């Protein structure tokens, strides 16, 4: 028969032996850089959706969320992606780019 003390200590050991990469409470600091070179730092959970970071950036910079794009390693970030899914590490850089409108035919 296993005592409750043994169960608790076994549970404690399994939590301690987890690797930091799989911890749901781990956070990473990410840098968001705009086209003018201005940088902002954001701390976010590795398993939190990046929409939180993107919305916070747009609110801080007074930008319309639908008019900007966020790019990491040459690919657009989707709102429901997480830093863990994109293998982001401390101080990684996300580029914010303004979406260009237009593209219609030229009429003089």
From Swiss-Prot:
Superkingdom of this protein's organism: Eukaryota
UniProt GO cellular component terms: cytoplasm; nucleus
One record GO biological process: protein sumoylation
Keyword Cytoplasm: yes
Region (Disordered): 1-25
Keywords: Cytoplasm, Isopeptide bond, Nucleus, Ubl conjugation pathway
Cited InterPro entries: Rad60/SUMO-like_dom, Ubiquitin-like_dom, Ubiquitin-like_domsf
Cross-link (Glycyl lysine isopeptide (Gly-Lys) (interchain with K-? in acceptor proteins)): 103
GO molecular function: protein tag activity
Subcellular location(s) per record: Nucleus; Cytoplasm
Residue ranges of domain Ubiquitin-like in the record: 26-103
Positions with biased composition (Polar residues): 1-14
Family note: Belongs to the ubiquitin family. SUMO subfamily.
Subunit structure: Interacts with SAE2, SCE1, SIZ1 and MMS21 Covalently attached to a number of proteins.
Matching PANTHER family: SMALL UBIQUITIN-RELATED MODIFIER
Additional information: Stress conditions rapidly and substantially elevates the amount of SUMO1 and SUMO2 conjugates with a concomitant reduction in the amount of free SUMO proteins. The SUMO conjugation system plays an important function in stress protection and/or repair.
Biological role stated in the UniProt entry: Ubiquitin-like protein which can be covalently attached to target lysines as a monomer. Does not seem to be involved in protein degradation and may function as an antagonist of ubiquitin in the degradation process.
Protein name: Small ubiquitin-related modifier 5
Organism for this UniProt entry: Arabidopsis thaliana (Mouse-ear cress)
Lineage: Eukaryota, Viridiplantae, Streptophyta, Embryophyta, Tracheophyta
């Amino acid at each position: 028969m296993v005592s409750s003390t043994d169960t608790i200590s076994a549970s404690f050991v399994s939590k301690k032996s987890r690797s930091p990469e799989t911890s749901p409470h781990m956070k990473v600091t990410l840098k968001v850089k705009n086209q003018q070179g201005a940088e902002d730092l954001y701390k976010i959970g590795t398993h939190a959706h990046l929409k939180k970071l993107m919305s916070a950036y747009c609110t801080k910079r007074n930008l319309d969320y639908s008019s900007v794009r966020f790019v990491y390693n040459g690919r657009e970030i989707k709102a429901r992606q997480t830093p863990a899914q994109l293998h982001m590490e401390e101080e990684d850089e996300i580029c914010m780019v303004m979406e260009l409108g237009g593209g219609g035919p030229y009429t003089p």
